[in-house]
Regions:
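Glycine-rich phosphate/adenylate-binding loop
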Residues: 2-9, 118-124, 128-217
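Glycine-rich phosphate-binding loop and adjoining beta1-alpha1-beta2 segment
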Residues: 63-97
Length: 217
């Protein structure tokens, strides 16, 4: 029986394939950008996968947590990664998908005291926290202390509500909010993979639209 040959494309082949899908000019822009993802749970891990597949040049991955069995139904981790730092597990998974993406990882909790340092190298910041207070902290900090950076945040993706209620709204010229803006775990009774991934897809797509200069009205 013939063995399976595991052939990784060269970087040139990889970039050429992406350019065929996105156009060379836009792909060059994608590959030159750094996106920070704050929180690597149901939102952040899925955002990271989408952006890595799109050929974003560098991702800054930030999360303090470890992979838990309750994460597996909606987050981009595997059963054999239980107990690993999410930063390490997601790094491994991303490099299997997109071998030439540059990854910077920080296994740390984002706080007011360290956020500016952690995010200063990013062109676009994705807020992907679970906690409402953390969401508010990061949003306010970016808007007040890093007004030159784009922020793509999320609010409302719990339960079995209609997929069509997930939307992207432009709040300011550099602040976008994805989600239904009302559902939460307490009122809806839980999180469903498909709806969380839908919101994450809105976030990732918004990042790509910003880079393509196709802004929401």
């Amino acid at each position: 029986m013939w063995g399976v040959v595991n052939l990784i494309p060269t970087k040139e082949e990889w970039n050429k394939a992406l350019a065929e899908r996105h156009g060379e000019k836009l792909q060059t822009k994608f590959s030159s950008v750094t996106v920070a993802i704050c929180g690597l749970g149901g939102l952040g891990s899925n955002v990271a996968i989408s952006l890595a597949r799109a050929g974003i040049g560098k991702l800054i991955l930030i999360d303090f947590d470890r992979v838990d069995i309750t994460n597996l139904h909606r987050q981009q981790y595997k059963a054999n990664q239980l107990g690993m730092n999410k930063t390490d597990a997601l790094r491994d998974n991303l490099l299997e998908i997109a071998p030439y993406v540059t990854l910077e990882t920080h296994t740390i909790c984002v706080k007011e005291e360290n956020a500016t340092h952690l995010l200063q190298g990013a062109d676009i910041i994705c807020e992907a926290f679970d906690n409402a207070e953390c969401k508010a902290m990061l949003t306010n900090l970016v808007l007040e202390e890093m007004p030159d950076k784009y922020l793509v945040a999320a609010s409302g993706m719990a339960g079995f509500g209609s997929a069509n209620s997930i939307r992207t709204r432009k709040i300011t010229s550099k602040f976008y909010l994805c989600g239904d803006e009302k559902s939460d775990v307490q009122s809806e009774g839980g999180l469903v993979s498909s709806r969380v991934m839908l919101c994450a897809a809105h976030q990732a797509h918004t990042v790509l639209r910003i880079l393509a200069e196709q802004f929401e009205t």
